[in-house]
């Protein structure tokens, strides 16, 4: 991820490198603290309330680091923090600690859920007011997932499906951005240069990567808007190919599987819920943004953990890694009893299923649809390549040159020597694409 950011946006690469150093320092410091997991559990209300207050502050002193845009960051002395990123982590900490402490209620639903609904509802209200809809969706998903893991009751997941569907319908009625993203997702080819521009360019980048990619630094992922952040998966797919895409998906799957393994062997319910919730957090967010890049899901605008540009996201992801390592370290302790393992198995199967679908989607664009996408008139990659690598000559049977390259590498253009045969030879134009023999003989 860092290499791709440096390659696309060097100034952001420098910032991300500094954030990586800070995140590594926080990680090392956390390993030396006496018992950070106990501190997180003991002050669960304080942590979540602090996160809510920081998020609320963005309504008054929020900024957008790149100039004009959604003011979701808090800034000071050139350092910017997006509070909604650690807020997701703090929600998982709060729910895990609260549910572990409230087991004695034996799931009297009114008594159990009231505090969680108040705090989670407050967080959702803030995120919706900010139009940070991708984070709001993750919040809602994590809330029901952790509740399902703690209760083991299928009705929780049934309620989750109903709530998410209702939220999607209501959101599409209230928020124009959701309507636009849904339309772009369902039929991107209707407006490929307008509202669907991002997703169309993203899948073109994946298609351009084919099986092995163009090579580091040799593709054109910069054609995809915000390729260093929201669409970094497409950028990696173009230069590393389907092989790199599958490798990245495999790493996400390995991370989630190791996190769930730590959850199953955790010595307490609190640590079990925490490990499973944080693993689900990384998995769900990765699936959402990769799915958006591949048109498997509507765009959400969240980051790809550990990969996309974003200091707040990187720092939060390193803290998640720290917590998972702390939970998995004490191997000498006996795992806490697990009367209902089915929810954890279903969570693992769901993650595997989703990642498999994404792998098939990447293969579909990179292999099956690569040829037609590469020759589309709105795909500028062929035109860029033709400027640097000559297309060669078209000759008749007598050896007469009909069409040839003129110019030098970087400024090659096609010249037709026999205009009367242009209907046959066709054209290779940066705006209108390929036709005639230029299209039929395209390498």
Question: What kind of region is each of these model predictions?
Answer:
Residues 2-131, 290-305, 309, 313-318, ...:
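Membrane-helix boundary/helix-loop-helix interface segments in multi-pass membrane proteins
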Residues 21-23, 238-257:
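Hydrophobic alpha-helical transmembrane segments
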Residues 25, 110-128, 133-173:
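Hydrophobic alpha-helical segments of polytopic membrane proteins
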Residues 39-44, 109-114, 151-162, 337-349:
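Membrane-interfacial entry segments at the cytosolic side of transmembrane helices
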Residues 54, 58, 93-97, 123, ...:
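Alpha-helical transmembrane segments of multi-pass membrane proteins
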Residues 65-73, 77-80, 156-248, 266-274:
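Hydrophobic, glycine- and aromatic-enriched re-entrant/interface helices and adjoining loop segments
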Residues 262-301, 307:
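Loop-to-helix entry and N-terminal half of a specific, functionally important transmembrane alpha helix
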Residues 328-443:
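Periplasmic/cell-envelope proteins involved in peptidoglycan metabolism and beta-lactam response
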